[in-house]
Amino acid sequence: MEERKGRRIIMFPLPFPGHFNPMIELAGIFHHRGFSVTILHTSYNFPDPSRHPHFTFRTISHNKEGEEDPLSQSETSSMDLIVLVRRLKQRYAEPFRKSVAAEVGGGETVCCLVSDAIWGKNTEVVAEEIGVRRVVLRTGGASSFCAFAAFPLLRDKGYLPIQDSRLDEPVTELPPLKVKDLPVMETNEPEELYRVVNDMVEGAKSSSGVIWNTFEDLERLSLMNCSSKLQVPFFPIGPFHKYSEDPTPKTENKEDTDWLDKQDPQSVVYASFGSLAAIEEKEFLEIAWGLRNSERPFLWVVRPGSVRGTEWLESLPLGFMENIGDKGKIVKWANQLEVLAHPAIGAFWTHCGWNSTLESICEGVPMICTSCFTDQHVNARYIVDVWRVGMLLERSKMEKKEIEKVLRSVMMEKGDGLRERSLKLKERADFCLSKDGSSSKYLDKLVSHVLSFDSYAFAS
């Protein structure tokens, strides 16, 4: 641990697990390099500060005692995700400004603000008004950002909005993507999606730099493309989660680990579809039967509420789990880093969220790719066609026989070298964090960049 530099970094994550987790990992990286860190977080989805004792947490809220939260959990439970992002940006804009002003005027030198890219130009306005430099964190990959940045072109060329008749056509401007791989999602307000994406891209262009949770050897061409488009300093210092000096924390419930310990090496399919994705009951049942019929041991994470219309496992046929016995295990949550690192894991059936993609790459685990929305589609295409460490299982083909076929193919490999390529990619990920690796060098540049910012004080 380096000595405190007497300088503070303010961080503003988007309040979703897939965005908060990499931001808190980045906070740990800065803390290890001697910076103090303050996390400004919305009262919506506010985390448990006791889990992160090295950082100062501030709740962003303009509530007076007894007033309703500006964005209640009940209000957002059934809300269109794009509409939710818009509400977050609208309702927390002024509380955010007041919070940053209070922090900058608090005495300790504030080096910069690090904000999630999706907050967009909202944070730029505040940073300029208060007089603090702003650096953007892109929690997703560079490849998907290139696709987002191309939205105006894609609309001009007629790729967007997506037409069902063109799903399998190649997007010649963004190889190897097909039309169905473009990072869109179902929304009642498609124009709002375009506005959110444009605001994210323009906010990155006007920043003092972009931090990427990726590594150069994985996305070199995409990073070069992004650098050319954005024309700001860029720092691909990932994978963030590999910087931690502490071993992966063990779960309080040892049942998962004990079960994995009893399985043969590389024999288990681990299935988990992220913190936001929801599936229909029919899909859930096809997954269940596909896993069972594959005759491979499986560990399946099913979040409560992730199957529409049910609380958890009520849809399973009577006696299903008893019939599986010790060959399969369904849980509400699993320590994913711990699971992927276990020698029993032979494949990861994933929604292809960026954090999950990186975690699987870092453990050399081949992937079965079932993307759900936005950047997950791009990630899946790169996993399958560029890095060649996975197989595609599209949601439109979620039928038990197809599931069984793909699971067997990945686990048996059929000579296609999935596992060998996965292990080679793992080696490249390991090297990037070594002393001479690209991520380590970019981290040194990032620290120097942040320290080069002039000292700013809040002028009232």
UniProtKB/Swiss-Prot annotation:
Residues reported in the UniProt entry to bind UDP-alpha-D-glucose: 275, 334-336, 351-359, 373-376
EC number: 2.4.1.-
Family of the protein in this entry: Belongs to the UDP-glycosyltransferase family.
InterPro entries: UDP_glucos_trans (IPR002213)
Enzyme class, first EC level, given as a word: transferase
CDD domains xrefs: GT1_Gtf-like (cd03784)
This protein's name: UDP-glycosyltransferase 76F1
Keywords: Glycosyltransferase, Transferase
Designated gene of the protein: UGT76F1
GO MF: UDP-glycosyltransferase activity
Keyword Transferase annotated: yes
PANTHER family: GLUCOSYL/GLUCURONOSYL TRANSFERASES, UDP-GLYCOSYLTRANSFERASE 76F1-RELATED
Stored Pfam families: UDPGT (PF00201)
